[in-house]
């Protein structure tokens, strides 16, 4: 799927039976959630449910990658269908139907990162300084770049904590990292969005975010 499919109103309705707004700042996440809802709906027609494990939309592109685990049974199907609905974004647009459940699975992402670490060369067992590693196996520059991109995507997704509300708010000229730290210090949950480096999601009310932004 291309997230740009979710921008023209007619295309979104025709392909996914959903509504979205090309003017909404959460357009990339909306596209991801519409695709996840379409996946859950397709599974439900065959008596199956889905667990969304990882979603990724590479910066600078309009493509979406979704990894899910299919589960058999009517109970799993009903549980997935219950996570599909409509929602209002912080920009005031009503969108959907879309997936309202988590977009990342922390246990799955930790296993992915552990697998990435396992692909690194082991420490030198024949002496040498602590932490010294054997020369890495030859790898093409393209393969190395893919490995770096995969690790970064997993790390960003893991940091975008499950359990926070859908959708994010733009941080303007303020540092997203600084605002996340300020919100956490004030007792709120917050994380940077994995879909836009200048946006964050939080359980804090909008007024609180605005006050911190102006401080």
Model-derived segments and their meaning:
Residues 1-215:
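SAM-dependent transferase fold signal centered on methyltransferase-like domains
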């Amino acid at each position: 799927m291309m997230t740009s499919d979710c921008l023209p109103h007619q295309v979104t309705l025709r392909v996914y039976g959903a509504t979205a707004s090309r003017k909404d700042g959460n357009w990339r996440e909306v596209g991801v959630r519409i695709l996840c809802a379409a996946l859950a709906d397709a599974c439900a027609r065959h008596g199956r449910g889905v667990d969304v494990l990882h979603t990724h939309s590479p910066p600078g592109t309009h493509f979406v990658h979704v990894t899910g685990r299919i589960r058999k049974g009517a109970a799993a199907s009903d549980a997935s269908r219950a996570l599909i609905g409509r929602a209002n974004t912080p920009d005031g647009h009503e969108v959907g139907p879309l997936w309202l459940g988590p977009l990342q699975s922390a246990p799955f992402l930790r296993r992915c990162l552990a697998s990435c670490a396992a692909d690194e060369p082991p420490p030198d067992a024949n002496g040498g300084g602590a932490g010294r590693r054997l020369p890495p196996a030859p790898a093409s520059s393209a393969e190395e770049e893919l490995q770096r991109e995969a690790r970064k995507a997993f790390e960003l997704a893991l940091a975008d904590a499950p359990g926070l509300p859908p959708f994010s708010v733009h941080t303007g000229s303020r540092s997203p990292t600084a605002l996340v730290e300020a919100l956490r210090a004030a007792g709120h949950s917050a994380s940077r969005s994995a879909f836009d480096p200048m946006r964050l999601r939080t359980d804090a009310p909008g007024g609180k975010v605005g006050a911190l932004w102006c401080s």
